[in-house]
Amino acid sequence: MTERRIIHIDMDYFFAQVEMRDNPKLKGKPVIVGGKASHRGVVSTASYEARAYGVHSAMPMTQAHKLCPNGYYVTSRFDTYREVSGQIMKIFRSYTELVEPMSLDEAYLDITHLVRPDLPASTIANYIRRDIYEVTRLTASAGVSYNKFLAKLASGMNKPNGLTVIDYNNVHEILMQLDIGDFPGVGKASKKKMHQHHIYTGQDLYNKDEFELIRLFGKRGRGLYNKARGIDHNEVKASRVRKSVGTERTFSTDVNDDDVILRKIRELSGKTAERLNKIQKSGKTVTVKIKTYQYETISKQKSLRDPIRTETDIYNIAYTLYNDLKDPEIPIRLIGVTVGSLEQSDFKNLTIYDFI
């Protein structure tokens, strides 16, 4: 049986990072995102600079103001965060259909079928992180392991912008040294109860037998017993069947130069073809999307008789669609190319070169 390979991707201080990206003056500052203090709001996300003052998520904003009176307080923009999250989830699904989102900024990916001797899971994780940064200009941390519990644990071990692999050769050492409060799923109340029973580390948890843990913690006891041994049989549950594959890019400045835009469409067509290759699909529709300098979004789609998957085929259709959409008088800030109506296709075995 093929050994599972699971990636857990967790965006770094997601809401605050989006705000820093959109307002560069906030970079390096203690940024706190959430509701207004006067409305009894809570902190959604705090930058690492703000965390140094003791500010953390779910903290009342009034308390955050006391801890960090000179912080930069930003009201949450959930429409923006959802839009960016959609871009990130699209990248995940360009690698595998087995994606289980846990929130706007984190997800599990089962990439077992992609792993090859020359293409380890850690390399794929880094390619995903690279793609996220290219599209969103945001960093992400990743954990790689043979089950979901360990992958999530790993993703938090080298933040921000880090990658950690937990495998059979290091899992026992990591778990034994881990503070019990750092085990995923162990909150403040559970930590306090464990301390009452002299459980402070993974080693202490490991030393308790299963029956004692069940006696102390009820049904959760069996799960805790397994966690101390790095055991987790839960599978990645795909949230939906993938219907399209696409890539989009935002220009650094608004553009109305056809040569520049067509070069970008060529690049996006190539990226989309690569992603179709990875998931072994081809498609019968091509869509080109444009966002103008005024943030108006327009798109045009063409349906095909036969499915396509190559860069050349995608580009030729995207070229025509762009020419139908463009207005020489209106600069654009974003261009996207998507292939939809996907169906299974026969592909060669993947190598590392398919991801570069």
UniProtKB/Swiss-Prot annotation:
Principal localization reads: cytoplasm
Q: Where does the entry annotate site (Substrate discrimination)?
A: 15
Listed GO biological process terms = DNA-templated DNA replication; error-prone translesion synthesis; SOS response
Q: Recorded GO terms, molecular function?
A: damaged DNA binding; DNA-directed DNA polymerase activity; magnesium ion binding
- What are the record keywords, sorted? Cytoplasm, DNA damage, DNA repair, DNA replication, DNA-binding, DNA-directed DNA polymerase, Magnesium, Metal-binding, Mutator protein, Nucleotidyltransferase, Transferase
What EC number(s) has UniProt assigned to this enzyme? 2.7.7.7
**Which cysteines are disulphide-bonded?**
none
Which cofactors are named for this entry? Mg(2+)
Catalytic residues in the record: 106
Q: How is the cofactor bound?
A: Binds 2 magnesium ions per subunit.
Protein name, as recorded: DNA polymerase IV
> Which gene carries the instructions for this protein?
dinB
